[in-house]
A protein has these predicted regions:
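Conserved protein kinase catalytic core
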Residues: 1, 11, 104
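Intrinsically disordered, low-complexity terminal regulatory regions
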Residues: 1-8, 109-125
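Short, solvent-exposed recognition segments
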Residues: 4-73
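Extended hydrophobic
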Residues: 48-118
Length: 125
């Protein structure tokens, strides 16, 4: 469920509406949340997902994930987990935009910023 969305003041505007429910089967946000979910949830979702258990292990190893045209054609995204005080992943923070602007490997530009933002959010929880 999307809880916050920010749009640029001008130009392309294509955000996920607050309150929108997105499938857990595609996209960087889904991969982050599923990578840290319980094994039962993973087993229920993975058969219909566009990614694999190995992909989720890569997310846990790296600590963030990127995708290009996975959930929506022409859109690239990067996501990182947000943890509560006990270390449990409770949310994902993401940035997305047109592949033409973000490229097919948007993590090179955005991963460090997202990890910093996730850390700041975690401190406020």
């Amino acid at each position: 469920v999307c809880v916050v969305a920010l749009e640029p003041p001008a130009g392309l505007r294509d955000t996920v509406p607050v309150g929108a429910r997105l499938p857990m089967t595609a996209g960087s946000g889904a991969r982050v949340l599923l990578a840290y979910s319980d094994p039962g949830t993973q087993q229920a979702v993975l058969p219909s997902a566009v990614f694999t258990e190995r992909t989720l292990a890569d997310v846990r190893r790296r600590g963030w994930v990127q995708s290009a045209a996975e959930r929506e054609p022409g859109v690239a995204s990067v996501s990182a987990p947000v943890r509560d005080r006990s270390g449990t992943v409770v949310a994902a923070v993401s940035v997305s935009g047109p592949i033409d602007r973000m490229g097919r490997r948007p993590g090179a530009r955005w991963a460090a910023d997202l990890l910093a933002a996730a850390g700041e959010l975690a401190q406020r929880l």
